[in-house]
A protein has these predicted regions:
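A transmembrane-helix-recognition feature enriched in membrane-embedded lipid enzymes
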Residues: 153-172
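A structural signal for short, hydrophobic/glycine-enriched beta-strand patches
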Residues: 1-154
Length: 173
């Protein structure tokens, strides 16, 4: 399901964080993220969307390409420009490598950037973004499918600890 609690604040760009693909299709978690991003983008048709996610060895396309294909197929009337960040393999890299695209588009880190991810992932993604210098993050949280919610939150708990130990962010910023 899609979070109906979509902020009305205008972002300069929308970063959609990848979350796995299966045989060239977005996972249920990723579909929810893309649907949430599309609902926001429909309100602001000129802002840049950045799809983030690299390629696994067993997939022919990067996550970013699959995400773009899903948006074009599911939301054909959406006219937002889309850029692909297709090298990343982690949340930290999603955000880091997207900065290159933002700079190319003359979008600074002080500008409002919407980061679309899952509800369980939002706090850590926001902390990593702040640590990397993003100064104005608008969190767009997609709901997690009921049948995988427990496992997702449990995995995120350990990722939160790991990220802190690896200095991907500070707990007290």
């Amino acid at each position: 399901s899609i979070n109906s609690n979509i902020p009305t604040q205008l972002a300069t760009a929308i970063l959609v964080l990848g979350s796995g693909i299966d045989q060239g299709q977005p996972s249920p978690i990723l579909k929810n993220r893309l649907d949430t991003a599309a609902k926001y983008a429909e309100r602001y048709p000129n802002i840049l969307m950045i799809m983030t996610g690299g390629r696994n060895l067993w997939e022919r396309q990067s996550e970013a390409e699959v995400m773009q294909n899903y948006i074009h197929r599911t939301y054909p009337r959406l006219k937002n420009p889309i850029s692909l960040e297709d090298q990343s393999r982690s949340t930290q890299q999603n955000l880091q490598y997207s900065q290159v695209i933002l700079k190319q588009q003359n979008i600074g880190q002080h500008e409002p950037i919407a980061i679309v991810t899952s509800d369980f992932h939002s706090p850590r993604a926001r902390a990593i973004a702040r640590h990397q210098g993003y100064q104005h993050v608008i969190s767009l949280s997609a709901s997690t499918p009921q049948n995988i919610r427990y496992n997702s939150w449990l995995r995120e708990y350990f990722a939160l600890i790991s990220g802190w130990l690896l200095n991907e962010y500070s707990l007290f910023q």
